[in-house]
C-alpha cells in the first residue's frame, strides 16, 4: 500500500487542500491510503472517509501540541500575576507529535487527549497538552506516534529525553521516527536527528512527503491562506514565510523515493527503501479504525419511553380537545381525526426510536414554563407534530392549521429530528444551565460553525491582504444580486463586467481569490445549536473550546452521522416583550392575561394588521411589510389570520423576485383570477389565492393527484427545494405516470364511500405497503375499513400532469414550510393583540426590550394611540418605563432614569432608595439633594445636572420649566437620544452671507488644487436664503453638465422637495461628498474618498447649517457611523457638537429604479417641512 499524508484546510492557515478533494487527488496520484494529520483537529476524517469508498484507506491522525506546563498561564491569571512576570519566565518552545488511531479505543483516547488540551486550564490561544498526558494515553497502545514536521520535537535541545520518556511509557513498537526529505537545510538537520534517534533507541524510521496543497503552483496559496487567517498583508515586512514548505504538493511515490535517496547522499545518512514502503504498510495495517456512522445516543428518559410518551400524549390530547386555545376547541366530529393522527405519529416515533427525544424536549419546555421562562409556541417543522402539541412542546394545533407531521419526520427514513425551540432572550442562559445540571457537563455541549470562503469573502480577503483599494473591492457586493450563489469566481467573471475589470486590474489578487474560494476560513460557534447525549461526549467526539463555551468537534452537518442529536435553543426578544407587557397589565389591572387563549378572529386586531399598524409587532414592523399589509387590507376579502401567515411566508426575496407575491396581492385585490390547474390543486391553494406557497401544498398535491405516500411527498419537497435535478427527474416521471392512474370509489363498512387514488399505498396489517385494490384482492386488512371498489374516475392527461409538475418545479425553490409562519404568526398576532387592547403596556414593554434603533419609530407610533413618552420624573420614574394615567384618562409613559446619558443602574437605584427613604415622594429639590447618595458610582453631580436639564426635577422645583416645555427639547435631544422624536428648532439662523459664500468658494478652489480636480470640480449650489443643507453622496452626469450640484436633472427629487417639503432650490444649500463625476471606467479610489470626506467635514464646519438632509450612505456616515445607513433612514438626530439636526434620507437616484420609495421620502420631507416651519 502507498500512503499519502495530508493536512487539510481544517488546519487553518496551514493548508490549501480541501478535505473533500484530498481523496480523489490521492487516488489519481496512485495512492491507496490517506493519512490525515490536521493540527489539533480530526473533523476532516468524515469528509475524507465519505469520499474514500472501498478502495481507499483513511487513517485518522492528529498533530498534537505539547508544552512543558500547559496550565501555567491559567494559574498565573488566577494568582493575578502580572503579564511582565509571565513574559519574563524562561520557557521552552512548544513541540508536536502526530498520533494515529489504531482502533476504537484509540479514537476515544485521542478524543480525551484533545478534550483535555481544550480545557480552560490548558487552552492558551491554541489547545495544548503536557508530555505526561500524552505519555499516559500512548501507554495504552491504541495509538501510533510519529515525530512531526514544523514544531518538531527535534527542534528541542532535549529531544532525546522527551522521546525516551514516551518510548519508556508505551514501547517502541508504536513509535516511529519520521523523515520528511525536503531538500532544505532546516529539514536536513531535523531529518539527521530523526535518523540518529531511530538508531539510538531502536525505533523504526519511516518516510513521508506530506501534502498541504494540490500542485506546486499552489504553494503561494497556502501562504496566502495563512495571511488571511492571521490578518497579515502581503507587503508586511515581517510576515512569516516558510520556504522549506513550498514543495508540499501531492506527488507520486517515486518523488518520495528520489527525495529520500537525495537526502541520504547529501547528508551521508544511510536510508532504506522500506522506509517509504513496508514500514508505511505496517503502520497502515496496524491502524484498522475507520470512521463510521454511529447510532443515536440520547439520554434515557424513562424505563419504557414509548409507553411513557403515549400516556403523556393521550392525557395531553384529552386536555387539548376540551380546552379553548386561540379561540378554538376542536368539534366532537373531528376528534377521531386527532386520535388517528396521534396513533400514526406514535407508531412512527416508536418504530424510529424517537420517543426519548420527545420526552427530553418536553422536559426542557416544562422546566422553562415552571420556572417562568417565556417559551415560544413553536418554530420550524416541529409545529407539524400532533404529539409535540399534545405534550406541550409546541402550542400549535397542526390539524387546525393544516400542518404535516411528515414535514418534520419522514416515516420511511431515519433522519434524526431537529427541534427548534424559542426561549426568552434574557433568560436563555438559564435554559443552557438547566441542560448542564440535568444531564451533566460531560453530556452537553454546543455545536461549532465551520465557515468557508465564498466568492465574495474570498475576493474581499485576498483584496485586503494585497492592499486593493476599498472602492475596487466593493465589486463583491454585486454578487448577492445574482440568483445562483454557487458560481465560482471564474464563472462570475463571465457574467459581471465589473468583476472582469477587477480581474484585469488585479490579476494576482484575483487568481489567489479563485484558488481560495471554498476553503475553510475559520471556526465559530453555532448561535443556538446544543447537543445533549446519552453517553459521555468524549466517547464520540473531542470537546473543544469556542470562546468560553464547550463545543463538539463536528459541525451541524456531521452531528447526525455521529449519533448526536441537535437542539436549537434560541433566544427571542419578542417573548420578553410579551412577558413584560403581561406584567405591566397585571400591575395596572390585576389581570393575568393568557395570550394562548385569545381568539384569532378578533376584528379589531385584524383591522390593525389591515391598516399596517404594526410598528413594534414581531416580523411585521418594516416599512415595506406595513405597506404590503395595507395593500392586502384593501382587498376584496377581509384580513384574516391566514392572510398574516401567508404574508410572512411571501415576504422573502425568492417569492418577491419570482412574482409569487405580486400574484397573491393581485388576486387578493381582485385584479386577476387565481391560477387554476386542477380542482384538487385549487382547493389546496384556496388559502393562498391560487399560489403554491407552502411545501405542504405540494406534498398534499402529490398524494392526492398521484398517490404518493407522504414519505415520498417529503422526498419531492426535498428534491425540488435543493434543486436535485436527478431526483426531480425520476420523481417527475413517476408523478406523471401515477397521476394518469385515476381514482377509485371505495365502499366502507359503515356504508360510506371514499374516493382514493388508485396508486396510493397503505400500510396493511401484515406491515406491507399495498394499494386498496391489491389489499382487497389479497384479503389483507387495510388501515381503513374498506369493503369493495364501487367505481372509478379517470386520472389526469399526460399533458396536464406535466403542466402541474412544472408548476411544482417552478415555485418549489421558493415554497416555505407552513409550520414556521403559522407558529411565528401566532407571536405576531399576540403582539398585535396587546398593542390593540393594551397599547400603553405594549409600548412600555417594546421600549424596554427592543433596541434603541427602534425607539424613534415606537415613540412616534405611540402618539397615534394618544400616548406620550415623557422625560424621567424623580417622583415617578424608576429603572424601567413607568405608566401613568392622567386626569383626562389619557396615558403617558415616563422614561427610566437610565434613558438619560450618564445615569447608570447604580444611579437609578440610588434615586429609588432615597425616594423610598423619604416616604415615596420628594417634596423639594433640597430634600432630593439631602437624601440621595452622591458617590461617584451613584448619582454624582454630572448625573444630577443631566437630570435637571431634561426636566426630571420640574415637578419638585417651583418656577422651573415644565419637562414638556419646548425650551428643554435641545437638552433632551442631546441627553435622551432616540426617545425624543421632536426635531430641535434651530436657535440660530442658517446664515449664508456674501462673506461665507466667498469662504466656501475659497475652500472649493483649494480642494480643486490639492486634489488635482481642475474643471472637474462640482461646486455646491447655494440658494438665495438657504434653510437646509442637502448632502448627496456624489456628483452625477447632470451635475457635470453645469458644474454645480442639482442645478440640472433630479426632477423627481425636486418635485418631492417642493410638494412634501415645501422647499425650492432657493431654500437649499446642495452639496455632495464626492465632488467629481465618477469615471465610467473606474470608481473613486480609497484615497480620493478620504480626501473628499475630509473636505466635506471642513465645508460643514464652515457653513454651519442648522438642518441637514443626508441623501446617501456616504453622507449619512459623516454624522453617524455607528449604525448601518439603511437602518437610519427616516430617523433624525440632534448633534450638539455641531448644533445641527440631521434628517437621514437615502440616495434620490433610487426613485428612478424603485418609485415606490417615494412615499418614504415624502414622509421624511414632510417632517423636515414641519420642523423648519416651527
From Swiss-Prot:
Compartment(s) where it occurs, according to its Swiss-Prot or TrEMBL record: Cytoplasm
E.C. designation(s): 2.7.7.7
Catalysed transformations (reactions): DNA(n) + a 2'-deoxyribonucleoside 5'-triphosphate = DNA(n+1) + diphosphate
InterPro entries: DNA_pol3_alpha_NTPase_dom (IPR011708), DNA_pol3_finger (IPR040982), DnaE2/DnaE/PolC (IPR004805), DNAPol_HHH (IPR029460), PHP_dom (IPR004013), Pol/His_phosphatase_N (IPR003141), Uracil-DNA_glycosylase-like_sf (IPR036895)
Predominant location: cytoplasm
Keyword Nucleotidyltransferase (UniProt): yes
Top-level EC class as recorded in UniProt: transferase
Any one GO molecular-function label of the UniProt entry: 3'-5' exonuclease activity
Any one GO biological process: DNA replication
SMART domains recorded: POLIIIAc (SM00481)
Keyword Transferase: yes
Protein keywords: Cytoplasm, DNA replication, DNA-directed DNA polymerase, Nucleotidyltransferase, Plasmid, Transferase
GO cellular component: cytoplasm
Domain of life according to the entry: Bacteria
Subunit structure: DNA polymerase III contains a core (composed of alpha, epsilon and theta chains) that associates with a tau subunit. This core dimerizes to form the PolIII' complex. PolIII' associates with the gamma complex (composed of gamma, delta, delta', psi and chi chains) and with the beta chain to form the complete DNA polymerase III complex.
NCBIfam families in alphabetical order: polc (TIGR00594)
Function: DNA polymerase III is a complex, multichain enzyme responsible for most of the replicative synthesis in bacteria. This DNA polymerase also exhibits 3' to 5' exonuclease activity. The alpha chain is the DNA polymerase.
Assigned protein family: Belongs to the DNA polymerase type-C family. DnaE subfamily.
Designated name of the protein: DNA polymerase III subunit alpha
Organism: Yersinia pestis
Gene from which this protein is expressed: dnaE
